[in-house]
């Protein structure tokens, strides 16, 4: 499926080279998010390599048709200075651990720490254990028990596949009948393959949703500016959940106090908890939050840049991403500077998305667009 992401800038941005020493940077992943990451590194003057095929990146970097298993050997043979892992799957698979064992500098959490995204059940268990505010929930690996519990709840209600499902494993059911149907699809009919073998059933939260991403070095937390993405496929918050149909920053409805509450009651307690559990977190921790009438609550944790939030945030970032990544790895302090401009990104997806979409469609007119396209 061909997906085009384009980011409209409201003000003219002048890019400057933030790092005078050219380094070899390898970006794992080839989507819009990874294009934005590679673009940022290129603007800083670095030599770009990408694992995966991205025609736009191939114009200013080198795209590699190699497997995940071949990455360590390639890095050693080609003296790669930094590996930046974009997607969640390689992180959950433990790619960063393997690279570190080979003496290769890699940005991202360990396999154990990546469980925060790799398992909704694990994430919820950690939130419950350490009193991190979230929706009321129960988790199940037995369909009959899950169905019986669901029958006693009220709609709307949220069903979450335990494992990775490319951002589509969350179902907001408007009726219990729909919820029972989706539960059976997940647990009995393998709608999300093995990812739905276990599920989380949780209350539906109402409020203003926002994405709080932080650079994290063990117990040190460096919040980014916040962004908001739109997950539903259609206008007016309708349609199925997707990986994200657009994003913008900053947000007017979220205050500095809301952000501080998110950091102090959600992100900081979680990274402290991970460290205490022997799974120190290094990389990007994404907290999907909801500003409710009774305070900020946690919807989910991810262990990498949000997509499409990444595309707008990296255009807004006025600090060196290369320096940030290395300082996080080394446990050094990070200084984040941001442009004052506002940014909005719109995602164009193949017809039929997020269900089985059309493939091979030709996208025309890109040369007429005077704005970054990822």
Q: What is each of the regions a protein language model found here?
A:
Residues 19-111:
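ATP-binding N-terminal substructure of ATP-dependent carboxylate-amine bond-forming enzymes
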Residues 26-27, 118-198, 228, 252-268:
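Active-site nucleotide/adenylate-binding loops and adjacent lid/helix of ATP-dependent enzymes
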Residues 8-10:
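Tryptophan (W) side chains
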Residues 173-295, 299-308:
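Internal nucleotide-binding/catalytic subdomain
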Residues 262-285, 302-367:
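Active-site "cap" helix and flanking loop/linker of ATP-utilizing ligase/carboxylase catalytic domains
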Residues 100-110, 116-117, 123-130:
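Glycine/small-residue-rich loop that forms an oxyanion/phosphate-binding "nest" at active or ligand-binding sites
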